[in-house]
Amino acid sequence: MFNPHALDVPAVIFDNGSGLCKAGLSGEIGPRHVISSVLGHCKFNVPLARLNQKYFVGQEALYKYEALHLHYPIERGLVTGWDDMEKLWKHLFERELGVKPSQQPVLMTEPSLNPREIREKLAEMMFETFSVPGFYLSNHAVAALYASACVTGLVVDSGDGVTCTVPIFEGYSLPHAVTKLCMAGRDITEHLTRLLFASGFNFPCILNKAVVNNIKEKLCYIALEPEKELRKSRGEVLGAYRLPDGHVIHFGDELYQVPEVLFAPDQLGIHSPGLSKMVSSSIMKCDTDIQNKLYADIVLSGGTTLLPGLEERLMKEVEQLASKGTPIKITASPDRCFSAWIGASIMTSMSSFKQMWVTSADFKEYGTSVVQRRCF
């Protein structure tokens, strides 16, 4: 039987990303735990030496990658591996947060244009597998905008698996104007890996995605003017990185050429507009009455937007694409890799949010389709 007092306790918040899952409790200023969205299953039928485990989660899986088959249950922002996702949530509930899911409501962020079947499967799993008392799906971009104390604006969201521009008006996303690019941080990391091998750097540790990802995060940047940067830096060493095995790799213009694919996806054979044109395209699909409001509140969200130089390059190109004299403001919070989680924490801590929960009683009466009517 549903207990309404179960909604009075702090909610568990999951921000499920292709690369990272962030978990914590509502009302807190940031997620308590951030783990890699990966599971490692033993390559052999016996548990890993001296450990009674058949699978490993997050960083532990990445650390033991040579003995494991790595599975990423979220691809391009969408849950695709449900069995592995269940294990990951179980790990977060029990091992990381130390809570009983049957005693606390759960809010999950979801990507824009999340398919109906995935939304309903999420609700089904939370209510039937984990027996949560309440559940809510919040649009990832809406939550990120909320963290910036705005309800109208355009969110530029780029994480590990997908990049999208999402116009939001008075707290609701405008699906017809969402622009999505199936390319983000993971693709930049893979592009850098290919470049390292092509340059003759075939050290075994480069096979470890975490190492190359760290190189990207520490050294790569977005050039304000790529062609001018190329003329200026050709042949120069722009950065160096010491690998775990002690070898030192020196880098030149590839440090800005690799992430340039965000603004020129055709370099990876992806025939889609780059980031600046995505912003312009999304805004132009909206009613003319709100276009200036969207330009005036562009909010960056997601770990890939932390690349140095991205904010300045985006501002320069959006100014060129917008009508002359259009006021443009870009907000780039230092903690924007967690902005959706933070926004969800703020939302769920408000007393008015209690009426938003889809309760276990609602689920029992209406079934999985209840999320279509209540979460938007």
From Swiss-Prot:
Keywords, ordered alphabetically: Cytoplasm, Cytoplasmic vesicle, Cytoskeleton, Nucleus, Transcription, Transcription regulation
Location in or out of the cell: Cytoplasm, Cytoskeleton; Cytoplasm; Nucleus; Cytoplasmic vesicle, Secretory vesicle, Acrosome
Outcome of swapping residue 124 to K: Found in a patient with Bazex syndrome; uncertain significance
CDD domains xref list: ASKHA_NBD_actin_Arp-T1-3
Domain of life: Eukaryota
BP GO annotations: negative regulation of DNA-templated transcription; regulation of DNA-templated transcription; regulation of smoothened signaling pathway
Main location: cytoplasm
Gene Ontology MF annotations: chromatin binding
Tissue expression from the record: In skin, expressed in the basal, spinous and granular layers of the epidermis. Also expressed in hair follicles, sebaceaous glands, eccrine sweat glands and semen.
Gene Ontology, cellular component aspect: acrosomal vesicle; actin cytoskeleton; cytoplasm; nucleus
Amino-acid biosynthesis keyword on record: no
Pfam family, one: Actin
Keyword Transcription: yes
Involvement in disorder: Mutations and insertions in the coding sequence or in regulatory non-coding elements of this gene may be associated with Bazex syndrome; a cancer-prone genodermatosis with an X-linked dominant inheritance pattern.
Family named by the database record: Belongs to the actin family.
Entry function: Negatively regulates the Hedgehog (SHH) signaling. Binds to the promoter of the SHH signaling mediator, GLI1, and inhibits its expression.
The protein's name in its UniProt record: Actin-related protein T1
Organism for this UniProt entry: Homo sapiens (Human)
